[in-house]
Structure formats: C-alpha cells, structure tokens
C-alpha cells in the first residue's frame, strides 16, 4: 500500500490562483498528453496502480464496547497513516495509555490514512488493516468514529483489483456507483457494530466542479443520501453526518455572508453547506473542517485572534442547520514554515479549543500527525518509536476530562487580555498568549504565567 500523507497539507484552494502555475501547467500539458497516449487504456487519469492486497477472508473482530460515559467526550483524534498500531509493542502500550486514560473519540477512514482498499473488486472485501486499527481503538477505550472515505478505484473509473493511490484523495465515486459506495458503507457498519457514528466522505474530495468554479453540492448530497439510508437500514441508532466540507477564508474582502477580523469565508463553501442542509434526507450532526489561516495572509490579525474564525463559523452552522450538533472533523492553526516552538504550537491549539467550547461545538477531532521515524514530530501525541507523551496529548486529555460536551461553562475574569481562560465549576484552564511572562489576576487570584504557558487550576466546586 502506498502511504497517504499522515497529515493533511496546509489548506490550498482547489482552483488555480497563480498565473505562474497556469503557465507551467500549459507547458506540461503537451508532455502529459503524449505520455498518456503512449500509456493507452487509462481512464479518467488513472494509472494501473498497484495490485490491491487481498488476504484470506477474516472474521469480523470482536471489539470491546465503548466505555459508558456520563457526557459525550467532545474531543478526540483522527488516526492517520502511522499510528500506535504500527509501532513496536512497548510503544503501542504507552500510546494506549495516553489515549485511554481519559476515554475520547477516535476516528478512522475506511481507505487510506493507514488502511488499504476495503473492496478491491466488486464484492471482494479486505478489512485486515481496518480490523487492526479498530481493534487498537477499542483497546484504548475509544468512542469510535468512522469516516466513509475514500472509495475503491473501480467506483471511480479505475481498474478493479488495483489501487492507484495517487487518485485516492482527488477522485469521487462516479454517480453510477453511488449505490455501490452506499453498499460498502453498510458492509462496514455490519463489520463493526460497536461503531455508531459515521462521517460521510472527506472534504468534498473530487466534488469540485472546475466548469462552474464551485463545489458540486448536488452530486455530494445525492451520494450522502444513499449512504444515509443504507446506514440507517443497518441500524437506526447509527448517527450519520455530513457534508465534511473545508471552509476556507481570505484576508481580502469578498462577497460573503460570513466575515470577521480573522478574514472572509469563501461563499462557495457556505452555499454548498446550505444546499446540503436543504436537500439531505436526514442528519444527526453537521460536519466541517478548516484552518484558522487565510489563503493569502496566514493568520490574521495574529496567531491567537485568528482562532475566532472557528467560533464564528460554529455559530453560523448552528443557526443555519436548526442547531444540529456541530462537528469539526479537522482543524489547523499553524502556517507553513512557522518556526513555532512546541509551547507556542500547543498554546495556539488551546486557544482554538477554547473557541470550540465557547461556541458550543459538539465534537472536535484533532488530526494526529504521527510519523514513522524517530525524530522531531511537531504536534504529535507521542514520540515516534519511543512512545513518550508530548504536550498535545495532555491538552486533549485535559479538555476531554474537564470540558466534555454539555458541561456548563462559567465566566472567569482575567485582568490581562493576554491570558485566555475557560472555566467550569471545578476547573479552570489559563493560556498565556504572549511570548513574555505575564502576571495577572485570574478568578480572583494572582498568577504569573511563563511565555505560552498553559496552566490548569482547581476551583473547588461541587
């Protein structure tokens, strides 16, 4: 299996934005056409790809039931190309402890991001990788989530029995195969009866229409409705959500109904969401993803204030959807080549999570960028190959324990605006958004926080 990136790249617009890129494309087209003609027999740009690996049929794993919880955890992670199930046993055990000490949501895609092609040929299933990943999730006390993406090549114009991984993230199922994709979704649901939450597709991949310069919300929604019906037929208690579309923004102003100091949202994403809201068969939650960074100027007006975008979008989604639970399937806060220290990285993440909690997000899933090799792993939850806990793991555990969905927040005053706070009856978290020591009175007590320090403090509530 050719690896898919363990971490999504910095958000890029799906349409050309640079003249230089356009000129380069023109130069390359002729060569590509000649190459394609020599290859012959390819369809929709699919190369032959590798032969999909299909082993002996395995019985469905017997998975532990998710732990009973008083509140929905709200916080969690998405497993990517490399995760704990790919690590040596000792490292996997340490990661299991990091993830399981406070049960949180854990999400896995059905194709790519660590697992192979689930149905290489029509009716021929291969769940070995997915079984392994779901088994680890259950062993680490996960509340499991599955993302129904991506789709086998034969549903997208490629060859049955082969997988062209270069097309995994760029091509959607053809309309004549929407029913086949829905059947695959139902087969997955039957394979893993302990999984009760499904997100349909990922980032509208393959649903951008260059001829109209907008998202193909009609095509996506048609596919979504078929998947929704198929999953509910397997088990009416299964929760299903979409449209899982990326919401991009720009610093420059444009015609959009949603804007703030953090930028202006691309109206085309909002239009696609509203189409889905109006034409969906049903939904148990609404899913989006996005970055605090604008496409043209990074984080504006600064790295911390830019996180206000998440709260503003969440409020808009709740209003437009009739207050459906809002899920952020991914969120990103760090510009390319930022040079941030790990302390600043985690402080900005904490600021984003405060925005999520204050705006009433039901679920926020952290895209865990684990890597294969030992060495620097910025933003990871544990050190690759060693299993040592990294700061982001503690942040997620703390928010999961103290700020699950439904917890009642309390207002806490800080005498210095550089110290952001989030509080409930029993616990307070403070974030120094400055690169300097800050002394402030918070919740009636004087504190001094180091640069970018995150500090938890008990409040003594019942």
Q: What is the meaning of each model-derived region?
A:
Residues 21-31:
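Core hydrophobic alpha-helical transmembrane segments of single-pass membrane proteins
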Residues 13-15, 30-57:
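C-terminal region of N-terminal signal peptides and the immediate post-cleavage residues
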């Amino acid at each position: 299996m050719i690896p898919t990136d363990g971490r999504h790249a910095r958000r890029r617009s799906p349409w050309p934005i640079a003249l230089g890129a356009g000129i380069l494309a023109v130069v390359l087209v002729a060569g590509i056409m000649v190459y394609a003609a020599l290859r012959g027999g390819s369809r929709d740009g699919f190369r032959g790809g590798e032969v999909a690996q299909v082993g002996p049929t395995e019985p469905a794993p017997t998975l532990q039931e998710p732990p009973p919880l008083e509140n929905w955890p709200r916080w969690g992670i998405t497993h990517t190309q490399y995760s704990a199930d790919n690590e040596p046993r000792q490292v996997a055990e340490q990661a299991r402890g990091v993830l399981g000490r406070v049960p949180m949501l854990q999400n896995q895609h059905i194709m790519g991001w660590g697992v192979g092609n689930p149905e290489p040929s029509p009716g021929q299933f291969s769940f070995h990788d997915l079984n392994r990943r779901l088994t680890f999730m259950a062993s680490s006390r996960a509340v499991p989530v599955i993302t129904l993406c991506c789709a086998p090549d034969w549903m997208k114009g490629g060859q049955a029995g082969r997988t062209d991984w270069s097309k995994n993230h760029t091509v959607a199922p053809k309309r004549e195969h929407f029913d086949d994709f829905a059947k695959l979704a139902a087969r997955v649901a039957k394979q893993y009866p302990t999984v009760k939450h499904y997100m349909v597709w990922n980032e509208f991949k393959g649903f951008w229409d260059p001829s109209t310069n907008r998202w193909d919300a009609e095509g996506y929604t048609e596919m979504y409705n078929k998947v929704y019906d198929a999953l509910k037929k397997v088990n009416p208690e299964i929760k299903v959500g979409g449209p899982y579309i990326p919401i991009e923004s720009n610093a420059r102003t444009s015609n959009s109904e949603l804007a703030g100091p953090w930028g202006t949202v691309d109206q085309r994403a909002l239009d696609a969401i509203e189409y889905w809201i109006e034409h969906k068969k049903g939904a148990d939650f609404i899913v989006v993803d996005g970055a605090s960074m604008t496409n043209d100027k990074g984080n504006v007006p600064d790295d911390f204030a830019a996180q206000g975008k998440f709260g503003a979008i969440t409020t808009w989604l709740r209003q437009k959807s009739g207050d459906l639970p809002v899920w952020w399937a991914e969120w990103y806060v760090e510009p390319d080549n930022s040079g941030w220290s790990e302390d600043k990285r985690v402080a900005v993440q904490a600021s984003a999570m405060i925005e999520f909690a204050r705006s009433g997000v039901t679920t926020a899933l952290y895209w865990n960028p684990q890597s294969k090799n030992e060495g620097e792993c910025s933003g990871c939850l544990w050190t690759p190959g060693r299993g040592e806990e990294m700061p982001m793991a503690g942040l997620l555990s703390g928010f999961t324990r103290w700020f699950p969905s439904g917890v009642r927040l309390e207002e806490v005053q800080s005498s210095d605006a550089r110290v952001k706070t989030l509080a409930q009856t029993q616990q307070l978290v403070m974030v120094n958004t400055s690169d300097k020591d800050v002394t402030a009175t918070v919740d009636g007590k004087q504190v001094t926080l180091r640069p970018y320090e995150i500090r938890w403090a008990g409040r003594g509530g019942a």
